[in-house]
Amino acid sequence: MQQALAGGAWTVLPDRIEAGTFAIAAAITGSRLLLQPVVPGHMQAAAEALRRSGVEVDLGAASMLVIPPRTGRLAPTDIQTAPHPGFPTDLQPQMTALLATAAGRSTVREAVFDGRVRHAQELRAMGADIRTADNRTLHVWGRPSCLRPGACVAARDLRGGAALLVASLAVEGATTIQECWHMDRGYEQLDNKLRAVGADIQRVPSPAITAAASACNNTD
């Protein structure tokens, strides 16, 4: 006998990738940041990677506190992505950006998605010393002040764009990120949330989009 469907209620889980992105942003800028709500069990792998890089991470019942390294410098560490509960592939580009500012060599191994290394080219344009060993492996030669102001880079995909945004926060000066709409697919008001904790971010229309909109508005 067919049964009728009934209504129900469900609480959406906090986004571990958004929380991890903010945690990495705090770490790369040497900032103290409290994130909540989070599910601690979902953040263990990201927290462990940050701890190996010298960052203090305190996971509470529903919170994550990120504290800058006591030494004032990030340490190199190796990471390899894996399905949950391993290190998330969707945080690999952001962590690569962070490791570019650590003092020493790190190796990043992408074991989930083939070819997820395109962000390395754009990070190199910002001054990072990243060498692509193959389409799954990056060798990062970190230097604390390697990222230069004035770069104009492009977000080729969602998480690669987040990596560029995280890296730009560590730059003393302006960085232009084109095609930032990629980030809107995976983050809700990312620029506004970062501004709320002190980031200087301005979203401006690209000339191509402005010209296209103007042409549409002038069409009879």
What is the predicted function of each stretch?
Residues 1-220:
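Short, structured segments at the rim of ligand-binding sites
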